[in-house]
Every structure is written in C-alpha cells, then in structure tokens.
Amino acid sequence: MISPSDLGPGSPVQSCFVEDVEPWLVERISEDPTILGRGDLVLKRASWRSRRVSLLLENPAEMALYVLELQLGPTDDRHIIRLVERWDATRKRHWRKRCFAVLVAEQIAPRYLNILQLISRAVPVALREIRVSEAAGTVTLAAVRVGSLLR
C-alpha cells in the first residue's frame, strides 16, 4: 500500500487519496473500461505493486487485446520499456488477435513523446493521462487522451 507522501507533491491522486490506490484503480477501470477511450473492453488480467498497475483488456467483438501499463506519478523510461516488453510477449502469445499498447500515467512528460512516436512505427501505442477528482465525497477517475500513435 502506498501513502499520499509516496506520490509526490501536486499529484492528483494524492489530493484525492484513496486507501489502496492500485486495487481502486483496477476496480474503476473494470467497472467502466470506456474511460480509457478504447471502447467497451473486458478485463482479462490485472496485477499491481509499487505504484504500477498492469492490465490486459480484450475487445471480443474486434478480436483485439489491449496491454495497459499504468503508473502513478510521471512516466519514466522503465514504464515505456515495460509496456513494450509486455506488448511483445502478449502479441506472440495471442498471435491471432490484434494487440495494442496503452501507456497511462498521471503525467506523460513531453520528452518521451518523440521516443514514443519512434516506437509507434513498430508498436501501436495509445497515450492517456489519468485525472482523479473528488466531488460531494465521491472520487472519480478519467483518462485524458494525450495523443494516439495508433496506426
């Protein structure tokens, strides 16, 4: 479990802190996967630890899989590498389905956009920044499109 101080100053999740943030994020996405902007998806697998959440989502109608890596706080190079590695392993394991990578963080630094654009020549990537807000005692989650590098 992380504490608000682990998230860094100014973190949206810190200001609307929920106990056990990672399971809460998985539950919100599972309840309403459309917040990711990829349509109505089914959660196939989830794991989390240390401010990171890994999800595998499926769109059965389109025979498509979405490998999602979510990181609390700003994205970093390890986040990007982990996403590409998981996407590649999933693509090889489920070779009959289309496979997409989705990078989600509280903040995607502009310095990574050029790298992600280069990666997108081989890997279909979607980028989302999560926004957490609180109104009338209810904490909500939204994923804002930063850019889509999907072909």
Model-derived segments and spans:
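Charged, terminal alpha-helix-loop-beta segments
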Residues: 1-151
